Design a protein with these regions (language model features):
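N-terminal lobe/hinge region of extracytoplasmic solute-binding protein
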Residues: 27-118, 149, 216-218
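Aromatic- and charge-enriched surface segment that lines or borders ligand/interaction sites
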Residues: 53, 57-58, 78-86, 112-157, ...
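Detector for C-terminal structural segments
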Residues: 67-69, 82-85, 229-234, 238, ...
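Gly/Pro-rich hinge or "lid" segments in bacterial periplasmic/extracellular proteins
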Residues: 70, 88-103, 149, 193-253, ...
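Aromatic-rich, solvent-exposed beta-strand/loop patch
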Residues: 109-111, 116-118, 134, 139, ...
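Surface-exposed binding/hinge segments that line
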Residues: 126, 161-205, 220-229, 374-385
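Ligand-site clamp/hinge motif
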Residues: 128, 211, 244-294, 336, ...
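Extracellular/periplasmic solute-recognition and catalytic clefts
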Residues: 168-170, 226-237, 262-326, 333-337, ...
Length: 608
């Protein structure tokens, strides 16, 4: 049915009205090398390579990276165990994205993408006949069908939330797969199905998918697993027979012959490992370390290079997350009161050397962050939910209170005390108690010991209010399992943000995901208003509509005080041993690590 030329010729043999109707319907269907949310792709068909790469980058050498904790599984698609780092390098997806462009994907496994921009109820991906898995087995439409059926039935909850709107996945032929969706208004879904790594049906036919395993899996991506030291180290080797090594989306990328991850107990031990040249590249997330500890000999003599690489990504919302499933954290007034006890201005000065900006929005550092009072268009989206939403959602965008920066802001703590009284909590006999006399005791769950110094000032201010906050530090496996089961009061989390948000919002904030173990909805939010706004975001036909809808969502989330916002920086802090070549122009929306290359070192034998 997709041979448009023959259809149009046939229609011309019919009477005029019938022919015009057929031509109009056919003209809406597009066959393209790329898929976009809105508008045209930046790179035309036949482009040579992505912009922020060196197409002539040499192949060879190695890249050593770090990871924290441990791992016990090579299956990152399920809600069990702790998956090893880097597994995404094993699997190709239908499309590939450029770190210079958002809202666009280009064909990788897919040679052609067929769709109707005015009807988002379906999309067809036509596969490249040369696509192969690493064992040489052809990759075909049945593998795509198997992947989505398996992830929806046995995969981690995030897949079920993300792809809940898939009605069917059908192999039309060995090289064509059709996705049908339950609604024709979700404009993002035809593109996002192209982002998932495709699994080999023939490999999993004799294996149990939903279990942890250290058996080396088969993939179709640029790397294969070459060595494993369970829980301590995993190494990947560039596949010399990689089927897509010469495709334009891969030119200048995946240049290292070897990529390995060395695991460390915590960030402090990992930093010592970097200083000892046990791995090559470190993204520094501690302001104090960046300001005071990069003064070791390899830095001063130029063997280690420090760089701040700006990006245009919205900042993730990092904060102390409340589990609103639990009393008293299900009370909005209590959550706002606890938020007033975090003195960011003091922490930024005393702990972070003034390096950070307070995060005030779930889309900070972007045009998606709500500002000031709601516009008429935003109010139109919010008004139907006035009775269900906090009044603050209809006023100026909620922002965390500022302090004098002395670590003990009396005005903020008095406001917190008033809110707690409003919620029925009163200070007596040395503790904050409810009407039954039960003291307020909370637990902060942590996995990184470095965060204890950030939590302690919050703990002291809460103690001044009569609240007992204990700190529980767990190993990675215990921590992940506690979060999967929502077994916590407070924890540190980071909610990713996108310049083109969509289906991922169902996992982060959707009501259905609130009670699904392992989902991204850590805070337990259940809100019909939020569900309606997410639906509108996924259906937005224009950028203006998307921005307005995200502004409204941002206002609602901020007014709920679901977490205590922390801080961000608009750049990457990178320390790297001087073994690498980098493209002249860094990407706008990422670090671009896959486009680096090995430039060599005379002492590589000793450095391994």
């Amino acid at each position: 049915m997709w041979h448009g030329v023959f259809i149009r010729l046939a229609m011309r043999c019919c009477f005029l009205a019938m022919g015009l109707f057929g031509m109009s319907a056919q003209a809406a269907v597009q066959h393209s090398h790329a898929i976009t949310l809105r508008g045209a792709p930046a790179l035309a068909e036949g482009f040579r390579h992505f912009n922020s790469v060196n197409p002539d980058a040499p192949k060879g050498g190695r890249l050593r990276l770090d990871a924290l904790g441990t791992f016990d599984s090579l299956n990152g698609f399920i809600n069990k165990g702790v998956a090893a780092e880097g597994l995404n390098r094993l699997y190709d997806s239908l499309t590939a994205g450029s770190e210079d462009e958002f809202g666009t994907r280009y064909g990788l496994l897919a040679k052609r993408i067929i769709r109707d921009p005015n009807d988002a109820s379906w999309v067809i991906y036509e596969l490249r006949p040369e696509a192969r898995f690493s064992d040489g087995h052809p990759l075909r439409a049945e593998d795509v069908v198997f992947t989505f059926e398996t992830l929806l039935s046995e995969g981690a909850p995030a897949y079920k939330a993300y792809f809940a709107d898939i009605a069917s996945v059908t192999a039309l032929s060995p090289l064509r797969v059709k996705f049908r969706f339950k609604h024709k208004t979700n404009r993002e879904l035809p593109m996002t199905v192209g982002e998932i790594g495709i699994l080999p049906k023939h490999y999993w036919a004799t294996r149990e998918f939903n279990r942890t395993s250290l058996e080396v899996p088969i993939g179709s991506g640029p790397y294969v697993i070459s060595d494993i030291d369970p829980g301590r180290r995993i190494s990947y080797a560039r596949n010399p027979d990689y089927w897509a090594r010469d495709l334009n989306v891969n030119r200048g990328r995946y240049n290292f012959d070897q990529i390995s991850y060395q695991y460390y107990r915590d960030g402090s031990v990992a930093f010592e490992g970097f200083k000892a040249n046990q791995y090559d590249v470190r993204e520094e997330n501690k302001a104090k370390t960046w300001a005071t500890e990069y003064n070791f000999p390899a830095v001063t003599d130029g063997r280690v290079i420090l760089q701040r690489q700006r990006h245009e990504n919205p900042a993730p919302m990092q904060g102390f997350a409340f589990n609103t499933r639990r009393t008293p954290l299900n009370d909005l007034a209590v959550r706002e009161a606890l938020s007033l006890a975090f003195d960011f201005e003091w922490a930024n000065r005393a702990l972070f050397f003034g390096a950070y900006t307070r995060t005030t929005s779930f889309y900070a550092n972007s045009d998606l962050a709500a500002q000031g009072v709601p516009s008429k268009a935003e109010l139109a989206l919010l008004k139907p939910w006035r009775k269900q939403l906090p009044a603050a959602a209809f006023g100026p965008a909620v922002t965390p209170a500022k302090s004098a920066g002395d670590g003990y802001d009396r005005a903020n703590l008095l406001r917190a005390q008033a809110l707690l009284k409003q919620a029925g909590w009163h200070y007596r006999d040395g503790a904050l108690r409810d009407v039954a006399g039960t003291p307020m005791r909370l637990e902060m769950l942590l996995v990184q010991p470095e965060f204890e110094r950030i939590v302690q000032p919050l703990r002291r201010n809460l103690a001044r209010l009569g609240i007992d906050l204990s700190i529980r530090l767990l190993d990675v496996a215990q921590y992940i399992e506690r979060l999967r089961q929502f077994d916590f009061d407070l924890t540190v989390t980071g909610v990713p943000a996108s310049l083109s948000p969509g289906n991922e919002l169902w996992s982060y904030w959707g009501s259905q995901s609130a009670d699904t173990p392992g989902s991204g909805n850590l805070v337990g939010l259940k809100s019909p208003a939020v569900d309606a706004l997410i639906a509108r975001i996924t259906q937005a036909k224009s950028r203006d509509t998307l921005v307005t809808s995200v502004h409204a969502l941002d206002r609602v989330l901020r007014a709920q005080w679901l977490l205590i916002p922390q801080f961000h920086i608009p750049f990457f802090r990178i320390a790297r041993w001087d073994f690498f070549g980098l493209p002249n122009d860094p990407p706008r929306y990422g670090l671009g690590l896959d486009s680096w290359w090995w430039k060599g070192s005379p002492n590589i034998a000793q450095e391994r």
